[in-house]
Amino acid sequence: MLNKLVECENLTFEESYELFNMLLEESEIRIAAYLTALQTKGVTADEIAGFAKAMRDNAVKIDLGEVTDTCGTGGDGSKTINVSTAVSIILACFTKVAKHGNVSVTSKSGSANVYEALGCKILENPDEAKVSIEKTNFAFLFAPKYHPALKKIMPVRSELKIKTVFNILGPLANPANPKYQILGVNSPELSEKVANALSKVGGVKKALVINGNGLDELNPNGASKITEYNGKFETYEITPEDFGLENTKIIPCESPNESARRLIDVFSGKINEDRNFILMNAGAALYASEIVSDFLEGVEIAKNAIDSGKVLKKLEMIKNV
């Protein structure tokens, strides 16, 4: 298959699935060659899907029932608060959430970094995750604990220092096989491709693949692109006005501790720019999870959950599980 990639020929879903499994047994130099050739050619939806399905199939097994995930690819180079973590905690007030996450790669506040800064502990195994979701509606699935098969590939990725298909795979490889998903991508060109790949992996009923003018979140200060999948695909542009919100600037964030503090400020009812940023994305997540029928309703119930103290109480439950 390496020759095929070098000749810039696309792989099928089945070939991509097979290639992922081959890479687990390959030498480091051949892993690097495959990943570089695939990246140089340009990755397709079938290739992303084949890799993602194989990654799920090689993951530690976990069954949490019907869950939602709020996960982004990261890699947008922005210094923002960790919005997806905030959204996942709000969402857990209404439905089961299995948040697939990792430490920071490019941002100042990866989801696992912020999760720990909030005072929550990393769950060690599927049994602990099941207890957490039963007690709180929330489980944080720390990616390295569920994808041990990747131990050989990860050092090669680090050594290469280029983007590879693995920069896209994280949100598509949740071992809990989420039925609902809001998935951030770091480039608008990826939204349709990743939505298509997610549909091919299977198991998802409804998903929003989002990009906020370069952010892997919806942008509170301009237009964002969404590709919605619910058995069929629809791509459209939205602005904060569609959520009943005013345009607000994004305040940079310098550390996981700062991100955690600012999330708690919002959960405590503080009215500021971060609140709008979080409400916009929470409204979309509630819509993606089929809890509400439109974005406006999603924002309203997210507001009510925050202002009633429900979200702060949910965070305390998660910390004490």
UniProtKB/Swiss-Prot annotation:
Its cofactor is Mg(2+). GO terms for biological process: L-tryptophan biosynthetic process. Mg(2+) 2 binds at D216, E217. Pathway: Amino-acid biosynthesis; L-tryptophan biosynthesis; L-tryptophan from chorismate: step 2/5. InterPro entries: Anthranilate_Pribosyl_Tfrase, Glycosyl_Trfase_fam3, Glycosyl_Trfase_fam3_N_dom, Glycosyl_Trfase_fam3_N_dom_sf, Nuc_phospho_transferase. Anthranilate 2 binds at R157. GO terms for cellular component: cytosol. 5-phospho-alpha-D-ribose 1-diphosphate binds at residues 72, 75-76, 80, 82-85, 99-107, 111. It is an enzyme of class 2 (transferase). Pfam families: Glycos_trans_3N, Glycos_transf_3. SUPFAM superfamilies: Nucleoside phosphorylase/phosphoribosyltransferase catalytic domain, Nucleoside phosphorylase/phosphoribosyltransferase N-terminal domain. GO terms for molecular function: anthranilate phosphoribosyltransferase activity; magnesium ion binding. Belongs to the anthranilate phosphoribosyltransferase family. This is Anthranilate phosphoribosyltransferase. The lineage of its organism: Archaea, Methanobacteriati, Methanobacteriota, Methanomada group, Methanococci.
